[in-house]
Swiss-Prot record:
Keyword Transferase tagged: yes
Stated name of the protein: Ribosomal RNA small subunit methyltransferase G
Gene designation per UniProt: rsmG
Function according to Swiss-Prot or TrEMBL: Specifically methylates the N7 position of guanine in position 527 of 16S rRNA.
Family matches, as InterPro entries: rRNA_ssu_MeTfrase_G, SAM-dependent_MTases_sf
Residues bound to S-adenosyl-L-methionine: G74, L79, V125, E126, R140
Length: 206
């Protein structure tokens, strides 16, 4: 049962959730699995794998978020933005992607699941000019750290941070971080049932 697995995984990462939040997370997996058959939103085909590779892989970041206003760049079907929005109703999330089918899916998820703290925008990140800047700029499986910082440099507020979700951290990629940016924290993340390296880099503009 997916619900029992979700309960166990949330307990493992010590993340409390209401019954409504758990239902929304499971319903999101259900919608992702259903839409994926027609729209090819993710290469992960199995709901149990989606729970680990998409939901839990997103939620391990939740305790590290600082601020109220976030943007998830290159969000795809809404990852990590939708799971994080479900678990953080006090924060708002802009989900940015350049593919219309992904944006349509996100909007349907928000409508069906009653998620009121996300807004989905179809745009390339370089072209997106927000009226209000963000406390946090999230990136998961979007681009190299160098490209993320180059393309998203205009998005954080004065004291905002970049949150780069990465797998393996290569010395080469770290050395290519552009001038004017500083890694303030590197956090090793533990995702339940995922025997792969996961890291969160917090980065600020100097």
């Amino acid at each position: 049962m997916l619900s029992a697995q979700l309960e166990a995984y949330l307990a493992e990462i010590n993340l409390p959730a209401t019954a409504e939040q758990k239902k929304q997370l499971l319903d999101f997996v259900g919608m992702l699995n259903k839409w994926n058959k027609a729209y090819n939103l993710t290469s992960v085909r199995d709901p149990e794998a989606m729970l680990v590779r998409h939901i839990m892989d997103s939620l391990v970041v939740s305790p590290h978020l600082q601020g109220e206003r976030f943007i998830d760049v290159g969000t795809g079907p809404g990852l990590p933005g939708i799971p994080l929005a479900i678990m953080n109703p006090d924060k708002t999330f802009v989900l940015l992607d350049s593919l219309g089918k992904r944006i349509r899916f996100q909007k349907q998820v928000a409508f069906e699941l009653g998620i009121h703290n996300i807004s989905s925008i179809e745009s390339r990140v370089e072209a997106y000019q927000p009226e209000q800047k963000f406390d946090g700029v999230l990136s998961r499986a979007f681009a190299s750290i160098h490209d993320m910082l180059t393309w998203c440099h205009h998005l954080p507020a004065e004291h905002g941070q970049f949150y780069a979700l990465k797998g393996l951290l290569s010395d080469e990629e770290m050395q290519q971080i552009p001038a004017g940016f500083v890694v303030t924290e590197t956090i090793e993340l533990q995702v339940p049932r995922l025997d792969e390296q996961r890291h969160l880099l917090k980065i600020i503009k100097e």
